[in-house]
Structures are given as structure tokens and as C-alpha cells.
Amino acid sequence: MEMTSGLKAIADASFDSVMITSAGGKNQIVYVNKAFEKLTGYKAKDVLGKDPKFLQGAATDPATIRQLVKDLKAAKTFEGRTINYRADGSPFIMHWRVLPVKSGRGASAKVENYVAIQRVISA
């Protein structure tokens, strides 16, 4: 995803964690902001190109992840809560929203990326 300088400035200034992934079955992280780094303890250079599943663990709710996958396959926005894990292994409860980003308009629009906005509920 090619980010304009204005869009990047907004994401970089956000208090919430922002992660952008590729679509089309690759599901690779292409961007994270500083709030993501602070929340998770992972540096951007260490997560770019990875599938975000590495943030999940034993207490991550499988039903929530199934709903996420279902909504994204239908090109719908997902919103939910789950437990993810920081780089040091500590869990955190987060509320997050994942939005499909489409190229084009109408029936021919294709999902190119997903934008995940994450907010910690409990440390």
C-alpha cells in the first residue's frame, strides 16, 4: 500500500496502534506506527513482512479470530476484543477494528490491504 505523506503523518501521530497488512492471501504486515511498537514491544523492522498471527497465543479467543477471518473474507469491517501478546510474552486485552481498504469503486473494487486499529483495554 502506497501511503501518502499526509496519511502516514496521521497514522504516525495516532495514540492508537495502527497496523496495515496486505490482502490477497499474503497477510503480511506492511506498516506499523510507533503506538504499535509501544503497545507490543516489537520494532517495525522486526515485524514487516510477517503474518500478524505471531501476536496471538494460548489465551487468544479462537472464535474471535474465526469471526475476523469471516468478516474480512466478506470485505466487511471487523470489530472485537481479544488477548494478544507482547514481545516479552506478557498478555494484553485489546479492542480492535480491522477495515478493508479497496482499490477502485463499485463491484470491481478489490481489497488490497487491511488496516487494524488496536487499543489496549487491560495491561
Language model region names:
Residues L48-A59:
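PAS-family sensory/regulatory domains
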Residues W96-V98, Q118:
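Sensory-domain boundary capping and coupling elements
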Residues T77, P91-H95, N113:
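Beta-strand residues that line the small-molecule/cofactor-binding core
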Residues A23, I83-G89, I93, K102-R105, S108-A123:
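PAS-family sensory domains
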Residues A58-K73:
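PAS/Per-ARNT-Sim sensory domains
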Residues F36-V47:
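PAS/PAS-like sensory domain cap-loop motif
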Residues E2-K26, Y31-K34:
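Sensory modules in modular signal-transduction proteins
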